């Protein structure tokens, strides 16, 4: 009978207990409010709508990042595909031509996050999924329809509840150091078909009598 050394058995045991590399439990579509971002970083253009910051496959207990290799990204050559991405997912610190040529922002997000769902979505499918999920909600119009408009402060609870009314899931909010609404995370189950409450939402931290600015 073949006997494995005790150390080998221990390594195999640990590997069996580890999560499958690249497996994910949910996906978070991270939308950014360009005005808030551009108050912290010099921008080349400032869209007047929410734009995609990323689509992040993740696990509740273990953060997934960089599940592939640095050279896993393929430059997107298709013109309509690039245009569609730029409208929804622009690189705010670069001119349009530079963004679409170098694709640094898209590359960075895909290498860091997209590779963590590559067993299910290839690169083309990943970016198309991000665009499709973004198009499910007109977040800016929805906020306006619920009384949240630019230039005013609102409690974190009001913004959270409004977004949940629209998406049917509790969001993950992030703010700048100046307490401006920056990111809105909308979470989906692993099939990307159903909105869920975001696990472990960080949300914005404010004093009880202060709100956050929607600039």
UniProtKB/Swiss-Prot annotation:
PROSITE patterns listed in its UniProt record: RNASE_T2_1
Species lineage: Eukaryota, Viridiplantae, Streptophyta, Embryophyta, Tracheophyta
UniProt-annotated binding residues for RNA: 32, 53, 91-92, 94, 105, 108-109, 112-113
Alphabetized Pfam families for the sequence: Ribonuclease_T2 (PF00445)
Location in or out of the cell: Secreted, Extracellular space
Signal peptide residue numbers: 1-22
Protein name in UniProt: Ribonuclease S-6
UniProt keywords, alphabetically: Disulfide bond, Endonuclease, Glycoprotein, Hydrolase, Lyase, Nuclease, Secreted, Signal
Species for this entry: Nicotiana alata
Reactions performed catalytically: a ribonucleotidyl-ribonucleotide-RNA + H2O = a 3'-end 3'-phospho-ribonucleotide-RNA + a 5'-end dephospho-ribonucleoside-RNA + H(+)
Purpose of the protein: Self-incompatibility (SI) is the inherited ability of a flowering plant to prevent self-fertilization by discriminating between self and non-self pollen during pollination. In many species of the Solanaceae, self-incompatibility is controlled by the single, multiallelic locus S. This stylar glycoprotein is associated with expression of self-incompatibility in potato.
Any one GO biological process: RNA catabolic process
Glycan attachment sites: 49, 59, 160, 172
């Amino acid at each position: 009978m073949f006997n494995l050394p005790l150390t080998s058995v221990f390594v195999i045991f640990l590997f069996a207990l580890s999560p499958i590399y690249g497996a994910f439990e949910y996906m978070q579509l991270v939308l950014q409010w360009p005005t808030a971002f551009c108050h912290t970083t010099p921008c080349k253009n400032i869209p007047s709508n929410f734009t995609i910051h990323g689509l992040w496959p993740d696990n509740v207990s273990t953060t997934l990042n960089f599940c592939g290799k640095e050279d896993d990204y393929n430059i997107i050559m298709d013109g309509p595909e690039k245009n569609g991405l730029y409208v929804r997912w622009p690189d705010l610190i670069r001119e349009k031509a530079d963004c679409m040529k170098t694709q640094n922002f898209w590359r960075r997000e895909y290498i860091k996050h997209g590779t963590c769902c590559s067993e299910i979505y290839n690169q083309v499918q990943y970016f198309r999924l991000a665009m499709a999920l973004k198009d499910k909600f007109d977040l800016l119009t929805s906020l306006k329809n619920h009384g949240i408009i630019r230039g005013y402060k609102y409690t974190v609870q009001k913004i959270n509840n409004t977004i949940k009314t629209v998406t049917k899931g509790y969001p993950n909010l992030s703010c700048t150091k100046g307490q401006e609404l920056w990111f809105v995370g909308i979470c989906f189950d692993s099939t990307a078909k159903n909105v869920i409450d975001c696990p472990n939402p960080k949300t914005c931290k404010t004093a009880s009598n202060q709100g956050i600015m929607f600039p």
